[in-house]
Amino acid sequence: LCYIYELVSYLCFPDILETEYMRSHLLIGAASSGSGKTTFTLGLLRALRNRSLRVQPFKCGPDYIDTRHHKMAAGCASVNLDGFMMSEGHIKDLYARYTSNADVAVTEGVMGLFDGYDAMRGSSAEISGLLRIPIVLVVNAKSTAYSVAPLLYGFRNFRKDLNVVGAVFNFVASESHYSFLRQACED
């Protein structure tokens, strides 16, 4: 949880993530399903709520189970943003409406960041690009260390219009394991 609180502190600086919608928002993405996006998102939502911030959760895609968990953690209904079923205009309108009274918005991605119905259509990357939401990647670090460097590099550079601002490592085995992962980020 200490990493969640570091991220919460980052979100509380109003100049860092300002866009046309609101000051602070993030999309929680990953390289694949099973990386820990939902668990991390729920912890982040609760940590932000515990700081007395008005948190608005969103979920990429048509998922109805994660949105129920979001509601319990954030204290308000989570809204689906579905690039396959909704027009770009509708997604923008929903996002603007639901973030208008929020201090911070957290959008949980679906599957891997670039996975969608037809290439990237309906993907988390599509939503991030459309709404200009910075991305934090949740990385499954089990059985890997410095090899995350090219993974992170690829995610940061695959689409220059997206803003990958950080990574959270899940399944970290020890302090020395974490030091390898941190070095990979810095390089």
Task: For each feature predicted by the language model, list its residue ranges.
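GTPase G-domain guanine-specificity segment
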Residues: 171-187
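ATP-dependent carboxylate-amine ligase catalytic core
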Residues: 20-35, 39, 45-131, 139-166, ...
